[in-house]
Amino acid sequence: ENTLENNEDAGRFRQNDDVVVENSITHEVVHTPPSYKEIPQFIVDFCDFFNCEKAKHFIHPIIRGVIIHFMLAYMHPFVDGNGRTARALFYWYMLKQGYWLTEYLSISRIIYKSKLTYEKSFLYAEADNNDIGYFINYNLRALELSFKELQNYIKRKTEAKRTSTTFLRIGNINERQADIIKIYYQNPKEMLT
């Protein structure tokens, strides 16, 4: 909600070719999508690819999800919100294929932190006859980093829970009180208000 420049553009296909993708810092044009006239056929092909259950050649679901992301971002069919939609479809496809852990990965944060590398992977793919190996490689690394972030988060939360549980053994205190005792234990000079 409230992520588009103009909320009336939600879900609307482009009706012209007055669109370019710019680097948010330098404002350099990094991508000019194909003509809006190609959008109707693209949508048919895109939906066929997305929903293909019996392909002639196997494409691993993670790779297919990345290709879905690339296809939508490359075509840029919507007036606004193409990047967010591409990432959302990637997540949705992964969940549809049974990769439930994807729901807990923050790939968007990794892309945000490495926006220039993300854009370069796109540019290299375009410059090399749409060889999306660059984009796939970037996204696999982003998935790996996101997974490591999730592992570290779980490790921190598990350790915090373990420490709080130790203080719960004191008796006659609840979990919130145990957390406060833990804060004082770890930082004796901490001032809580």
Q: Model-predicted segments: where are they?
A:
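FIC/Doc superfamily catalytic core
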Residues: 1-193
